[in-house]
Amino acid sequence: MKKLENEPFAAKYCSNAISLKRSGSSIERISNTLYSSKITMTPHQIDAALFAFKSPTRKGVILADEVGLGKTIEAGIIIAQTWFEKRGKVIIVAPASLMKQWQSELSEKFNLESVILDRKYYNSYAKRGYINPINLIESNIIIVSYQMCSALKDEIRNCRFDLAIIDEAHKLRNVYNEKSITSNNVKYALQSFKKVLLTATPIQNNLLDLYGICSVIDEDIFGDINVFKYNYIKNYDENIEELEHRLKSVMHRTLRSQVQQYIKFTNRIPKTFYFEQNDIETAVYESIRKLLLDSGENSYLIPKSQKHLIVLILCKLMGSSMRAIIYTLKNMRNRLIETKQTGIIEEINLEDYEIDDEEYVESSIIETSAKIDQNQINREIETLTSIIELAESVNEESKYSALLQSLKYSFAHLKKIGAEEKVLIFTESKRTQEFLSERLKRDGYEKVILYNGSNNDANSKEIYNEWIMNHPASSVISKNINMKSAIIDKFRKDGQILIATEAGAEGLNLQFCSLVINYDLPWNPQRVEQRIGRCHRFGQKHDVVVINFINSTNVVEQRIYELLNSKFRLFNEILGSSDTVLGGLEDGKDLERSIVDIYSTCRTNEEINNAFDALQDKYKDNITESIQRTKEELMSNFEEDVQQYFTDILTSAQLCIDETERLLWRLLQSVYGPLIPYDDENFVFEIDGKKYRLSSKNCDNFYESFSLNSKLGERIVEIANSYKYQYGHVVFNISDYKYRLSRIDKLLGKHGYMVLHKVSIDSFEKEEHLVFNAILDDGTRIDQEVCEMLFRLKTTEYITSPFTDSTVRPLLEDSKINIKNVINQSEEKNNKFLSEEIERLNLWADDKIQSVQLEVEQMRIQRKELQQQSDLVSNSIEKENIENQIIKLSKKIKLSWLELADAEEEVENQRKQMISNIRKVNSRESRVEMIFLVSFEIA
C-alpha cells in the first residue's frame, strides 16, 4: 500500500455529494443556491421556488404571493438554480422601471451578472450588421422591458432560453384579446420557453384574467375560451372545486396572514408639510407654464423628438428646485444660441435628469432647417433669459424652508421611538441633490451623503477608497456594486442624511432607516412605491414615516398628491399600495402622460380641477363587489394551515445548508490537506496569498467568499473529480473529531469494505444518486447514513490493488440490490409525473369536445329563436327569409353533429399521440459508475 498525502477518496465523495443533480422539488436540490446566496431565508420563498421545480412536465408556473412577500427573491432562487444546474440562459421581462432593480438584486443577492437589453444596447450591435445581436450577448441572463420584448419578438423567439421570468405578469391578462398587441407579442416571443410568471393580482377585473395569464404558460391548460366562460363564469358555483384543482397545479400563492410568524410587518405613517411659494417663485412658475402653453409646432424651443420628454422634465422641475430649473433653462438657451449660429437643430442635453425609462429616450436625432427664423429664435432666447434671471433672483426657497422644518420633526420623532437617527431624502434631479447637500451642510447638518447614478464627486470617492481599504476582497467585484456597498456602509455607521436620486437608489436596502422624505414627488405611483420600499421592507423594525411637501399655492401639485394618496393609497398601508390598486395600473407612465397633458393644455384653475376630476374618475376603484367576492373566495382556497409546514421547510432548509457547508469545508481539506493553513473555528483559510471564508460566514465581505459557485469552488471540484484512484484503504480517525458521533463510536476498531456508486438517471429530468454499501468483517451491514457520517472524519488514505472477487462479492451483490431500489423509486416518482400529465391531457381533450358541443347548442338556441320569430311574422317575404335561415341552420347543426363524432375521434388520436410522446420522454436511461471501492478501518 502507498500512503497518500491528501484524502482523494474523501474528496471524491464530497465533490460528488455536493454537486449531485437532483430532480423534483426537494430542498436538497436548491441547497447550494440557498447556501451561496445572500438572502434571509423565509419558508414561503423556499416553498414557492420549489413549486417551480415540482413537475418537469409543466411548461411553467405562476407565483402569485400577495404584494410585499418577495416574489423577486423567489424568482432569483429559481434563476440561480437554473444557472447552477446547466449554466442555463434566462430572459427576464419586466417593466422598464424595474429592470435595474432586477439587475441589482441578482448581482447582490445571488452573485449573478446580467445585461439590460435596451434599444441603445441592441442598436450598438445591429448597426454593425449582426442579424440577431441577442445571440452575441455573453451574459447568461438578459433583462428586457415589455416594449423591447414586443419589438424583438422574432429575434427572442429564435434564441434558446432555458427559462423566462415575466414580472408583473398581470399586464398580460388580456392576451386573449387580439387588440392587446404587446401582450400577444410577448406571448409569441416566449412561447417555447419554460416560464415563471410573477403577479400579486392574477385576477383583476374578472375570471378571464386567469384564463389569459394561464394561456401565456400553456394554451392547453384551459383550452377554448368559450368553454372557460361556460364552466367557470356562467356556472362558477358548480365548478369552483374543479377550477381550484386546475389552478393548484400551475399557481402558487402565499398570503401575508400566513407568514406573520416569520415576517414582522411595520406600518407607514404619512406626514405632510405645506408651504407657500413667494411672489418671485410664483412668477417663475407661471412664466414656465406660459412658455410650455405657448410653444407651438413652429417653436425652436423644444426639439420635436424630445417634445414629450422636455415638457415632462420642465413640469417636474417646477416642483424641485430653482437650481435644477436654471440649469435646464440654460441648456435650452445654449442650444438655441448654437442653432442660431449653425442652422442645425440638436437635442437638449438632459444629463441633470436621470431618464431610464427607455420609451422616453429617443435615438439621437439632428434636424436641419433650410432657413432659421432669426426673429423667432431671438424672442425665444430673450424669454429664456428673462426666466433665468428671475429664477436667479430667488434667495430663499420656500420648499427648502419646509424641509428644514421636516428635519427638525424627523430627528425628534426618531429619537422618541428609539430608531436610528437617519433620514433618506429623494429627488429626481442631480442639481437639486447638490443644492440640498450644500444648503444642509451650511445649516448645520454635516453628515450628509449623496448617492446617484455616477457618484463621481470628491466625497463619494473618498468614501469608496476608505471602504475598499477595509474590504480588500471586494476589489474583484464591479465598482458600481462596491460604490453602493460603500455608501450604505457609510450611511449606516456615520451618516445622518442620505440624499438619493431615482436611478441611484434602485436596489438599495436601507432597513436601518425608518424615515423617507420625498423632496419632489414622482408622478408614477410605482416609482413612489419603489422609493418607500428602500426602507419599508423585510427587516425594518420601526414604522416608517413618509414625508411629502405640498405647495398650497399650486393647484396641480395639490391634485397630484391627492391622486397618489387617495386613489393609489401609497402612503399609509401596511405594505404600501395594495396589490389590487397598483395591479390595476397598466403602466405608471400613462399617469405621467396624463399629468403632462394637463400642464400643457389647462390654463385656469377651473380647467386644471376639471381635468384632475376626470383623471381620478379614470383611476377609480373599478373592482366590483361581485368580482371582489369571487377573488376572495377562489384565492382563499389557497390558504391552508401552513404554520407547521413552513416550520418544517425552514428546519429542512437549514439542515441542508449546514450539510452543504460541512461538505464544502471537508472537500477543501481533503484536496489541499496540510498544504494550506485553516482556521476551523471561523472557516477561514488562505490560498495563493488570498484569504477566503465560507460565504455563509462572510457577512462583512472582509474575505473572498468561498462557495461551490465561486471560481475557487469550481476549481476544487474539478481537482477532486480528476482523481483516478478507485481502489484503496481508508482509515477513519474518530479520535481527531471534536464532536461525538454515537453511531460511529460503536464501530471503533472495526474493519470492513465499502463501495460508492453514482447512479445517473435521464428521464423527465436528469437526476443523480450516491449509493453507499459497506460490510464489516463480521458480516454486519452499515447503512447509507453511517457511511456518509464516516466521511466527516479526517482520513488517512492509501492506494491498493483491486480486491479479489471473493472478497467483495457480498458487498457488490448488496450494491446491486440498493441500486435497483434507487432506480425503482425514481420510476415511481416519474410515473406520478406521467399520471399528472395524462390527467391534464384528458381535461384538455374534454375541453376540446365540449367546445364543439357548446357551439352546436348555441346554434340550436339560435334556431329556436328564429322559429319563434317566424311564428310571429305575417309578412310572407320576411317569413320566407326566416325559414331559409332556419333550414340553413338546421343543416349546419346536422353537419356539426357529424363533425362532432369526427372531432371526438381526432381529439382522441391527438390525446393518444401526446401521451405517447410523454411516455417516450419518460423512457428512462440509467448509468451506474463506481466512484471507489475501499477497505476501511475506524481508529
What kind of region is each of these model predictions?
Residues S145, E446-E557:
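Conserved RecA-like P-loop NTPase helicase motor core
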Residues I337, I365-T368, Q628, Q643-D847, ...:
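P-loop NTPase motor cores of the ASCE clade
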Residues F265-Q277, I313-L317, I326-G495, Q643-R693:
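Conserved Helicase C-terminal RecA-like lobe
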Residues M1-L50, K54, K71-T72, W83-T182, ...:
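SF2 helicase/translocase NTPase motor core
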Residues I131, I137-E138, I142-F161, Y176-F193, ...:
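Inter-lobe coupling linker of SF2 helicases/translocases
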Residues R58-I78:
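Walker A/P-loop
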Residues K888-E908:
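Amphipathic alpha-helical coiled-coil segments
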Residues L4-A11, H542-E704, N709, G713:
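C-terminal accessory region of SF2 helicases/translocases
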